[in-house]
């Protein structure tokens, strides 16, 4: 039993006055209330923290989901650009404006630059607007033409189709002239010189091209392209030296060696080839790509044994008493002359070919038909050179 009576919070000393006792009991009561309040606050804080954790988890989950969808959109774009863009727009990851799509392509994170090039080169109205917006994201002010081309050609991979290249280089030339008024008389001049620089880059840095152009030849080739007048020799010489000292960088997803040229061929397979000087049949692995026919001793070889440029050649079906399913490559304009081609000797030397015609035997009639069809498609008159010739004629007519 409590000495001197009980109360909230335990016993009360007997020697306290009545007033002191009441004050002590009041203090104890308030202490208990405070402890209860603290416990209630702790419980409420714990509840709030749980809610915050749940919200954070939901936000993180949303961010994770968004990142997953963006990654999926990029993959879809690399497989089919139109479907990829559509997926990103439908999932509110991209606005449907040409400017927003152009920004997405310009940043290029996780995107295949070959696919970017193909998409930008399409002739649909929307793609053309995207191309325009994409080019406007490039700042070419105070850059010489080679510097501007380096920047432009690093942001995507030029497609192989002449009409696509035409649209893209036209957009580039217009943008360059807008950023650098007074450098060229017209966008046609910029367009033609840009192509001359791209071809110069190939001629100087492709080891299969043995006849390397000099600065003088480059200057001569570009006479009269500035509305009938000549560009300053110093300008052309500086552009030449820039390309000679440093080739254009090719976007990494395509690489810069021959292996990548053969990565996506028009056709490939084993065929028999009749020798040019020694008339024996040799089994070779053929690859048709970029308007050239390459042949290798083995499928694993990185360097071809021979290269046959298909420009100016024709193809015909022939009968051969020793081999079935034969066709020939020949030059209809120069019958009897050796076809311009090259081959690699056993000691590694690159020499000119010895063929007046290339006679080839396929394993079956079906494969012969397929090869002939593919080669015919490849050796149709190259629209790229027609396109460039048209532009040069346009400049000449302005004289």
Swiss-Prot record:
Interacts with TAMALIN. Interacts with FRMD4A. Interacts with FRMD4B. The gene is Cyth3. It is found in: Cytoplasm, Cytosol; Cell membrane; Cell junction, Adherens junction; Cell junction, Tight junction. One of its GO terms (cellular component) is plasma membrane. Promotes guanine-nucleotide exchange on ARF1. Promotes the activation of ARF factors through replacement of GDP with GTP. Plays a role in the epithelial polarization. Keywords: Cell junction, Cell membrane, Coiled coil, Cytoplasm, Guanine-nucleotide releasing factor, Lipid-binding, Membrane, Tight junction. Residues 77-206 form the SEC7 domain. Changing residue 355 to A: Abolishes phosphatidylinositol 3,4,5-trisphosphate binding. It holds the Pfam family PH. Disulfide bonds: none annotated. A 1,2-diacyl-sn-glycero-3-phospho-(1D-myo-inositol-3,4,5-trisphosphate) binds at residues 273-280, 284, 295, 305, 354. It is a peripheral membrane protein. SMART domains: PH (SM00233), Sec7 (SM00222). Residues 14-61 form a coiled coil. SUPFAM superfamilies: PH domain-like, Sec7 domain. GO terms for biological process: establishment of epithelial cell polarity; Golgi vesicle transport; positive regulation of cell adhesion; regulation of ARF protein signal transduction. Binds via its PH domain to the inositol head group of phosphatidylinositol 3,4,5-trisphosphate. Residues 391-399 are annotated as: C-terminal autoinhibitory region. One of its GO terms (molecular function) is guanyl-nucleotide exchange factor activity. Its main location: cytoplasm. Residues 264-380 form the PH domain. This is Cytohesin-3. It comes from Mus musculus (Mouse).
